[in-house]
Amino acid sequence: MAGVVVVGAQWGDEGKGKIVDWLSSRADVVVRFQGGHNAGHTLVIDGKVFKLALLPSGLVRGGKLSVIGNGVVVDPWHMLTEIEGIQAQGIEVSPESLVLADNASLILPWHKDIDAAREGALGAAQIGTTKRGIGPAYEDRVGRRAIRVADLADPAALDLKIERLLAHHRPLRAGLDLPEPDGAALKAALLEIAPQVLAYAQPVWKLLDEKVRRGSRILFEGAQGVMLDVDHGTYPFVTSSSVVAGNASAGSGVGPGAISYVLGLAKAYTTRVGAGPFPTEQDNDIGKRLGTVGHEFGTNTGRARRCGWFDSVMVRQACATSGVTGLALTKLDVLDGFEEIKICTAYKLNGKTIDYFPAGLTDQAAVEPVYETLKGWSGSTRGARSWTDLPPEAVVYVRRLEELVGKPCALVSTSPEREDVILMRDPFEG
């Protein structure tokens, strides 16, 4: 048995979709364990583009079991729409290939209303939420009033759950100048889709326990990145779930002993979507070039990503909090043609040099990057599949990142194509 967790080691958008797709060829089961449909994956397979947000990336590969774990908040309407979308692209989806945790919490239309109203009220201080109801759904989950997948099979329990929700949401919506919530309409909408959703529902913890006992290879697919973790990220400019690798266990129902390798993904530079501190941001021609060449626009939202140099301090911290075993470095080809490339090796804060990202919001905004400059390369790295295909300067760059982060590179991705990967160590081989 081997369990590999894939987590982003920056602010998300590190190319997890491609790497998970590549690793899924070695896996029997692919599991989503946190987040919702707020983080998109783009997969390019035989020239065909698949855009996923909620569904595990393993679905686009035949012969794999894909699982949505209990740690995910699920918009059931979006789930069904996304299933229909990839079915239209020729992908077979059935209860034999996709399983949904029966104890996963649901995202409701009310959650989206609240998300959008709160974000709009913040004005210039907006966090940058996708307004898809993720945060409010997690609030109801923690508040023990969430509607869960299993409740769709029990109309009597659904009535009680909706009454409990109404007691909380009525005054909340009134304070946000939102219309009175309609419990009857919500129940009718949920019961209408219940048969379709319940067809995929199972006790995922039990299913995965059986897979572990049989020695199956399980790939745990994280969403977002560690620096968006609700505890360890740039709070409050974070997501509403735990993104670190440790949550792969809690968010799927398997014990931590099932995890044998943690793969941390990082771009060869840095990007961020939405507001929040970003020490190495390049709000200039360099940032524009990175964004243009790297096609840095959100899969779900289309929002332009902020771009900057690689921040080894941040990635090292993300690796520490997630227990990363090895790195997968992506988008190395975007740096082709730069005469020089900078790497952040430390921060300056109030005149002192520090080697970590501080927890306080004021300090996070005040840190200044300390850079090391490396020579760039004029040759192309695009499509490289071995070290010998890389310009010498690119090899030096990758090796320097390994030194600064303190983790070896297991994989280097050199294009969006699935097979354009330099493999140093197969995570499933330990």
Swiss-Prot record:
Plays an important role in the de novo pathway of purine nucleotide biosynthesis. Catalyzes the first committed step in the biosynthesis of AMP from IMP. CDD domains: AdSS (cd03108). It comes from Hyphomonas neptunium (strain ATCC 15444). This is Adenylosuccinate synthetase. Substrate binds at T299, N300, T301, G302, R303, A304, R305. The gene is purA. IMP binds at D13, E14, G15, K16, N38, A39, G40, H41, T130, R144, Q224, T239, R303. Homodimer. InterPro entries: Adenylosuccin_syn_GTP-bd, Adenylosuccinate_synth_dom1, Adenylosuccinate_synth_dom2, Adenylosuccinate_synth_dom3, Adenylosuccinate_synthetase, P-loop_NTPase.
